[in-house]
Amino acid sequence: MTMESREMDCYLRRLKQELMSMKEVGDGLQDQMNCMMGALQELKLLQVQTALEQLEISGGGPVPGSPEGPRTQCEHPCWEGGRGPARPTVCSPSSQPSLGSSTKFPSHRSVCGRDLAPLPRTQPHQSCAQQGPERVEPDDWTSTLMSRGRNRQPLVLGDNVFADLVGNWLDLPELEKGGEKGETGGAREPKGEKGQPQELGRRFALTANIFKKFLRSVRPDRDRLLKEKPGWVTPMVPESRTGRSQKVKKRSLSKGSGHFPFPGTGEHRRGENPPTSCPKALEHSPSGFDINTAVWV
């Protein structure tokens, strides 16, 4: 009994030590989680502040008589939530919370949750302002391919549709003048209205121009090839077909002479078959189907 009691005491001590170590680890994790939550809430506040600054810049700047106009409009929903007028000052860029103040985290979270709600209401104005010049002058190369073709001719696609599309796209005229006009028009507007969609469209147009120049350098020159090798564009399909029909006709004649060794039957075949077989071969060759080719090839 004494040995068992000693073993039980040892096990209990080990359990107590493990519980103490787990408690210490849990306290450390709790502190780390608190620090991470504080950092996330500060990031949210910074996001709200940058969004407000972008809205102020995109709005063309406040009226000289009221410098705090756009900011007060964004702060009205905070007052409607039942909080005092001193709470919305957290949204201003001048006030920055510290990392050590862990007691203010719930208030920051509530302020962030209420400040993020009115932002989508005011952002459509910015998106509409950004979509305005894009609707007037689209940068999509497919629309230019369909509408701004060479000599305003309809788009004709052959067997290899992708190759025809790329060829027609390479034949399109350059749109550098339109881009310069867009840049001069955008210079009059404030800098804040140049959003991410316009920047992405500009970068895509730049990469498309580089790709187009590369393909034009790789593509063979048709005029030079026509001078060196005239007639390389149009393959001689009818001549090959007629040559094939003549070869098959010779084969059939030689085969016929082998099957009919008697002179009477040979003369009978020579007298009757040539006027009938030659017109048939000449008639069926342009259609692309020949009986002789179906038999022997």
Curated annotation (Swiss-Prot):
Protein name per its UniProtKB record: PAK4-inhibitor INKA2
Ranges for region Disordered: 82-109, 175-200, 234-285
Region described as Inka box: 137-180
Composition skew (Low complexity), residue ranges: 92-102
Record family assignment: Belongs to the INKA family.
One GO term describing the cellular component: intracellular membrane-bounded organelle
Classification lineage: Eukaryota, Metazoa, Chordata, Craniata, Vertebrata
Ranges of Basic residues composition bias in the record: 244-253
Compartments, as annotated in UniProt: Nucleus
Encoding gene per record: INKA2
MF (Gene Ontology): protein kinase binding; protein serine/threonine kinase inhibitor activity
Role of this protein: Inhibitor of the serine/threonine-protein kinase PAK4. Acts by binding PAK4 in a substrate-like manner, inhibiting the protein kinase activity.
InterPro entries membership: FAM212 (IPR029267), Inka (IPR039201)
The entry's keywords: Nucleus
Subunit-level organization: Interacts with PAK4.
Domain comment as written in the entry: The Inka box (also named iBox or inca box) binds and inhibits PAK4 by binding a substrate-like manner.
